Amino acid sequence: MSLTSFSIQDILARTGGNRGKDTRTDGNNISPPPSPSADEGHNEWPRAENPPLTPEKEKTDTDSGTEDFHWERDTETANNGAFTDPSSGDRLADSPKSSKKRSRAAFSHAQVYELERRFSLQRYLSGPERADLAASLKLTETQVKIWFQNRRYKTKRKLIATQTAPKSSLVPTRKVAVRVLVKDDQRQYCPEDMLSPSLLSLYHAYQYYPYMYCLPAWVPHLPL
């Protein structure tokens, strides 16, 4: 069985007599192919508004229609903002937090020294004074304002800490009795006794008396 050509030339070359032989179908049924003609060497489908579909082409069209439907549904969902990538959920959740983080300004030693010196003289600055100080230090007015606020808070916290410190030192100390085991016959030595012990203690500590030797008197010998 040869395949029927669906080219435009073949459709236009068909005569009007073949139109009467077309059989229309109701619903989704496709009309059966007509009997082959004698003057044509191959089978042709009669001309119709919608040419019949082969099983392969019908399957391809059905798949393409399904893909188009999915693509339209995904596009509509993405436009409504409901479609989100699960892998990018954490990044989307963290993006507002990262945008809210502010970079901390780093001051040089000269700037900190000048700010400290000005703070020791004046803790509160007016608008013009703040602008002049910021211009001289090459800073913004916001940076100078925030630095003075933090410095005042730090000073206040130190003051509160110093005020609460004496109260803790006034707490009465408790005396705790400690038992010391000392024998009754044991003598307690003072530091002075340890440095210069008395002779009496050494005398009593000596166990034996010294021996006394009696020597005869020396008598000179006179020559006779």
Curated annotation (Swiss-Prot):
Tissue distribution of the protein: At early tailbud stage, expressed in the pharyngeal endoderm, concentrated within the pharyngeal clefts. Also expressed in the mesenchymal head cells in the future infrarostral cartilage. Beginning at the mid-tailbud stage, expressed in the muscular layer of the midgut.
Alphabetical list of InterPro entries matching this protein: HD, HD_metazoa, Homeobox_CS, Homeobox_NK-like, Homeodomain-like_sf
Residues annotated to bind DNA: 100-159
Biased composition (Polar residues): 77-87
GO biological-process terms attached to the record: cell differentiation; positive regulation of transcription by RNA polymerase II; regulation of transcription by RNA polymerase II
Superkingdom, natural source: Eukaryota
GO MF term list: DNA binding; DNA-binding transcription factor activity, RNA polymerase II-specific; RNA polymerase II cis-regulatory region sequence-specific DNA binding
Keywords per UniProt: Developmental protein, DNA-binding, Homeobox, Nucleus
Main localization (coarse): nucleus
Stretches the record annotates as Disordered: 1-107
GO cellular component, one term: nucleus
Cell location: Nucleus
Biased composition (Basic and acidic residues): 55-76
Family statement drawn from the similarity comment of this UniProt entry: Belongs to the NK-3 homeobox family.
Miscellaneous note of the record: Based on similarity to Drosophila 'bagpipe/bap', the name 'zampogna' was chosen after an Italian musical instrument related to the Scottish bagpipe.
Name the UniProt record assigns to this protein: Homeobox protein zampogna
Annotated organism of origin: Xenopus laevis (African clawed frog)
Lineage of producing organism: Eukaryota, Metazoa, Chordata, Craniata, Vertebrata
Gene: zax
